[in-house]
Amino acid sequence: VAFANAVGVINLHKKFPLDKSPEKPTNAAGQTYADLSLIYELNYTSTLSIEKAISKLLLSNILVYAEPHFIPKVTYSPNDPLANPTDQYHLQTINAFNAWNVNKGDSAIVIGITDTGNDPTHPDLFNNIKRNYNDIVDGLDNDGDGYTDNYLGWDLGMNDNDPTWQTNAHGVHVSGLSSASADNNLGGAGTGFHCKYLPVKIADANGSLIAAYEGIKYAADHGCQIINCSWGGGGASQYGQDIIDYATINKNCLVVCAAGNNNVDGDFFPAAYNYVLSVGNTTAIDTKQASSNYGYMVDVCAPGDNVNSTWPGSFYVTSSGTSMSSPVVAGAAGIVKNQFPSYNGLQVGERLKITAD
């Protein structure tokens, strides 16, 4: 392809080769479906800067947009392990116990955890993992989804069926806040109570989140009604918005995102994209946590300051950040979805916003 040769391309391929264009341009509400079948990934070796390479590509007049592949970062700082595994003040703060009197979620509701990986052996997580019984581990892609043996989730960072954490256990802590088994006489409780979770590892062996937005798509394609993103960075991209559009408009998911920990009134992505539920961080006395981002992009806030959750090796530790606040809300979203099954993802998010104090 001439436009690709102009920048010394060594690889050009469809990002999502199994995707097809939507049958209709919009949904019943008039919202435009995202067409991910048109997205290509390109690698080049020339000495051109990324800005000049993009300019040359756009001169072809056949591209809608061209942009770098932004790699976000996780959004927390961990503390030391605690001896008291029941120290979960956030449940009282958000009135989780009262909510559970009305609805305790259901195993049919699945929360996608796009993060650094899972601990499938943790006794407070193991039973709440969403299992794919259509693709048991036998070396075959039994369900034909393009992912062989994705029985317990998927590792997009390493492209294998083991989403266990490697260098950063951030995802283990996040998973417990939304999805730790409740009412099992062990450890703490996830806000989603009976809701399941799907581990989607988006980090490579070094902990770099190289497949963050691809993780959102994977979760949306594999039955998750709620998708948690406890990561992000500064830099908007059309690709990122396209993925959010796909998850929320095409697939009717709710995407819940950490607002960031820079104590600024400014954009942080994916939290600042359209159709996302952005979550800020509050303290044990229900005030803004010092590092939490704030401003127009924040939709709701939840406790995320020294909150206790699961950690590898059957441990529980406290950690802080909007990374912790986000899964608290994601679990609550699962409860709302189960209480109002006809709601699409955006409606679940609106319900959370209008009922927050």
What is each PLM-predicted segment?
Residues 11-14, 40-43, 65-67, 110-114, ...:
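Structural recognition of the beta-strand scaffold that forms the well-ordered cores
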Residues 177-178, 198-205, 225-229, 304-357:
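Hydrolase catalytic cores
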